Structure formats: C-alpha cells, structure tokens
From Swiss-Prot:
Keyword Ribosomal protein: yes
The protein's name in its UniProt record: Small ribosomal subunit protein uS9
Signal peptide: none
Tagged with keyword Cell wall biogenesis/degradation: no
Family annotation (Pfam families): Ribosomal_S9
Gene: rpsI
InterPro entries: Ribosomal_Su5_D2-typ_SF, Ribosomal_uS9, Ribosomal_uS9_bac/plastid, Ribosomal_uS9_CS, Ribsml_uS5_D2-typ_fold_subgr
Record GO terms (molecular function): RNA binding; structural constituent of ribosome
Alphabetically ordered keywords of this record: Ribonucleoprotein, Ribosomal protein
Protein family (similarity comment): Belongs to the universal ribosomal protein uS9 family.
A single BP term in Gene Ontology: translation
Length: 130
C-alpha cells in the first residue's frame, strides 16, 4: 500500500483485528465497509473511536481494518486494541497517554468452559429435596 503506513494487531475474546494507519482525513474502513455500515450499534462505534479521540487524531489518519472472529463487542474491542498498537508505532510518545486510559493492555478475559455435570460453566442443575 503506502510507504508511510503503520500496523497494529488487536485481540479481544475470540476476535482478531489487523489495523493499518496512514495519514489522511479520518476515513475508517472495516472489512471493505464504512464504520457506520459495519457497526450498527453506537456503543461499538464509540469504542472504535476512543483511542483516536484521546490523542486528537480523528481527522488526521485513515484506517484500513480487517477483523475476524467473535461478535460485535469482541470485534470492537479488538479494533480498539489494534488502533492503539498502531498509534504507538506511529508515535511512541502517545504510549503513556494511551496506557493511562487503559487501551494498551489486552483484556485477557475469556469465556469460561462448560463443565461436565453442570448446565453452564458454573450453573448447577436445579436441586430437588424430594
């Protein structure tokens, strides 16, 4: 693509996002669709924009993103993590600000597995006294 582009990989739950950043005018493309087309929920769009708004670069950078796996919330979180990593590659001085906001740390929470003899991960079958 361009010679001055920056890359970041983001992960959250079972989603993985590859984020490419280059100087531009604020266009965000996710899986060949615009941010508004890809995420119907306003909260997901807000999560994606958070790192850019924090460092005031919403209108200065173009983002090209491919994201796979998981659901809407997981994908939004993965994109946010990827954007954060790409921004740090773009300008290392942004790291402390992004870390303070909590965007640098990967959210390691995963779905707990279902156990044998239980209905879900922790939900036990109903107990009947008699």
């Amino acid at each position: 693509m361009a010679e001055n582009q920056y890359y970041g990989t983001g992960r959250r739950k079972s989603s993985t996002a590859r984020v490419f950043i280059k100087p531009g005018n604020g266009k965000i493309v996710i899986n060949q669709r615009s941010l508004e087309q890809y995420f119907g929920r306003e909260t997901a769009r807000m999560v994606v924009r958070q790192p850019l708004e924090l460092v005031d670069m919403v209108e200065k950078l173009d983002l090209y993103i491919t994201v796979k796996g998981g659901g809407i919330s997981g994908q939004a979180g993965a994109i946010r993590h990827g954007i954060t990593r790409a921004l740090m590659e773009y300008d290392e001085s942004l790291r402390s600000e992004l870390r303070k906001a909590g965007f640098v740390t990967r959210d390691a929470r995963q779905v707990e597995r279902k156990k044998v003899g239980l209905r879900k991960a922790r939900r036990r079958p109903q107990f009947s006294k008699r």
